[in-house]
């Protein structure tokens, strides 16, 4: 729901700010109004600090113009759910350390949009829940970001729980599995950790590539895998590429990943993209005609997540501009969004970053380790991951045949700098905004 006062404020902000600023900092905010107080909720701490520093005074000035007689007070908080999760992660003793194990009920088989690109993955996932003892185990799904791997993991979990609510069905992202193990070692509770994960009925482990070059974590995963497999418990794994091509993973683990059935999920074809858009429009009560959905689907083709993001932008801007969603409106919006982004590929990103830092592309893709080269290289790798559909392995290849783990390390390092006000992260944000404008 968009409150009338906040809607007026958004219109003024849209005029005052650049499209990049508006979509990057304002659109993610959630707002409620009570007793003449506007409660603004940010999705994370970084945006919270940025809004307080850069935009609170702008909000106040606009609201004073809108309701000069009695302007509302503004209170900014981090969205409650996110805050609670963050607190839980750092609690130590006597607290359940195994987080992120809940299955998301939103993701079911019935609302997974099937098409030629994902039909085999869908069928295999559904068949996996039939609980046939001799059926393929593990099931390994791989493909680029935003194609539905996580949706299928949760759908599998939900199906098992519908059959038997007492089953111990655990969904967890690989990074959280690793973090839980580290916390257990720190808290001298590693036996508890082992007992927990080795007593699972169904393990749904997302983004297995995050185990890359983590020797102890891989040992624990190896032992957990063997225990569950020998007990004929179910295992489903996902990754961004075929098991054989995940660098930094032991051959023992790779061979086990391939013991069952390995299925790829590909980017959706045109018909599936249209179906996804119409389904998402129906779910979100957006009036979207088939012709408009087809037009969008022809322009956006990388993944489901991008389709959803574009649809949300179109919905918000149609509300703000009080216009129906027509092909002409969509053309205007897509032209703005895609003006620079349409030509974005890894080579283009390398050119822009090299020019910004006044270095040569040949240096960026070389083996040079000086800070003047390493930082631009890490920024360029992270931009490539965020702004293109390429996997870590493919990005590594484009940067002088570097290992998948080098790209993963760069990506994590740049993202960790969000918490610190560093010059490197400022450079990254500036370049991201320039490329994504």
Curated annotation (Swiss-Prot):
ATP binds at residues 146, 148-150. Keywords: ATP-binding, Cytoplasm, DNA replication, DNA-binding, Lipid-binding, Nucleotide-binding. Signal peptide: none annotated. GO terms for cellular component: cytoplasm; plasma membrane. Residues 319-437 are annotated as: Domain IV, binds dsDNA. One of its GO terms (biological process) is DNA replication initiation. It holds the Pfam family Bac_DnaA. It is found in: Cytoplasm. The keyword DNA repair does not apply. Residues 102-318 are annotated as: Domain III, AAA+ region. Residues 1-82 are annotated as: Domain I, interacts with DnaA modulators. Residues 82-101 are annotated as: Domain II. One of its GO terms (molecular function) is lipid binding. The keyword Translocase does not apply. HAMAP family: DnaA_bact (MF_00377). Oligomerizes as a right-handed, spiral filament on DNA at oriC. Domain I is involved in oligomerization and binding regulators, domain II is flexibile and of varying length in different bacteria, domain III forms the AAA+ region, while domain IV binds dsDNA. Belongs to the DnaA family. Plays an essential role in the initiation and regulation of chromosomal replication. ATP-DnaA binds to the origin of replication (oriC) to initiate formation of the DNA replication initiation complex once per cell cycle. Binds the DnaA box (a 9 base pair repeat at the origin) and separates the double-stranded (ds)DNA. Forms a right-handed helical filament on oriC DNA; dsDNA binds to the exterior of the filament while single-stranded (ss)DNA is stabiized in the filament's interior. This is Chromosomal replication initiator protein DnaA. It comes from Buchnera aphidicola subsp. Cinara cedri (strain Cc).
